[in-house]
């Protein structure tokens, strides 16, 4: 089967049905279809409304703290001895990750639609914290579904969500991780369609969620593009981001899609290795199927049953990926590689000791490949990596992995 040709105009995607080529779409229960269609119309209206956009920009600036800096990682650049490495510092946002960008956009949309109750799913807890934060800011009740496994390994974020007034509901079905939390959130949504808004955190789910999340996260790439032009006088040779569902990556990639000279590189979680059954690399080791309302690459067995994903990083522990990433993979516009748990831990330590920045385990996966990419590109070239979250939430996981007690 030949890969589809690259389009001349990426703005043509998704189509009216939310399809990126053969991916995306709206695969939802009959009871949800009217709500999903209403959401699509409401988002299209909001996107075209200058007042909504101005309101979002104001909150991004004065509440979230945007723009985030673009930082030259001088010591890491010297360490690897190749291209100049820049970090897009989205871990400096309010709440400590890129998740606030999307949470702000969607809460404003939910209020515009007259919704009075917010639900969300979370893996690492960062999206849960961001959702609880905006619900506290705007005075809306918040329920966050979180896998029981993730509740245990992300206790600081569970406490933060509770402190912000959210109710955290542990989900013990399956492996008790992000997929299972999303399943429970979808069930809640079906039951409470009239007053409840489901604030999805990743660039997946039924249309219009993948495009909404992409648009709200594209502030990352838009800022990075402007900042690197100001600092270096040209575009980077590569931009790199970690990928679970793919929201931070598509946010970085999208403003560079039309710049064919810029390589787009996504880094999946290889867990114990992609040759084992303990990984979360759905593009590397999966095939197309339908999950959580959209068609995309998924980890599945010969019978089409979803295989449980594994990663040391709770935010990458998902058996699928956003449909736009599946599309970019198939047309060859973006490249996707992977990083094991062990490699991510080494990168976590390296960034901490060389740059004085403790990254989240999610972007540590990207950093583990950035050194090789910088060496491959060579001196005089530029690579920009999205440092999408800070590592406070991961210190217990890292300490346990390193055999240390806190």
UniProtKB/Swiss-Prot annotation:
This is Tryptophan synthase beta chain. Keywords: Amino-acid biosynthesis, Aromatic amino acid biosynthesis, Lyase, Pyridoxal phosphate, Tryptophan biosynthesis. Tetramer of two alpha and two beta chains. The modification N6-(pyridoxal phosphate)lysine is found at residue 99. The lineage of its organism: Bacteria, Pseudomonadati, Pseudomonadota, Alphaproteobacteria, Caulobacterales. The gene is trpB. Transmembrane segments: none annotated. Its EC number is 4.2.1.20. Its cofactor is pyridoxal 5'-phosphate. One of its GO terms (molecular function) is tryptophan synthase activity. InterPro entries: Trp_synth_b_CS (IPR006653), Trp_synth_beta (IPR006654), Trp_synth_beta/beta-like (IPR023026), TrpB-like_PALP (IPR001926), TrpB-like_PALP_sf (IPR036052). Pathway: Amino-acid biosynthesis; L-tryptophan biosynthesis; L-tryptophan from chorismate: step 5/5. Gene3D superfamilies: 3.40.50.1100. Belongs to the TrpB family. One of its GO terms (cellular component) is cytoplasm. SUPFAM superfamilies: Tryptophan synthase beta subunit-like PLP-dependent enzymes. The beta subunit is responsible for the synthesis of L-tryptophan from indole and L-serine. It catalyses: (1S,2R)-1-C-(indol-3-yl)glycerol 3-phosphate + L-serine = D-glyceraldehyde 3-phosphate + L-tryptophan + H2O.
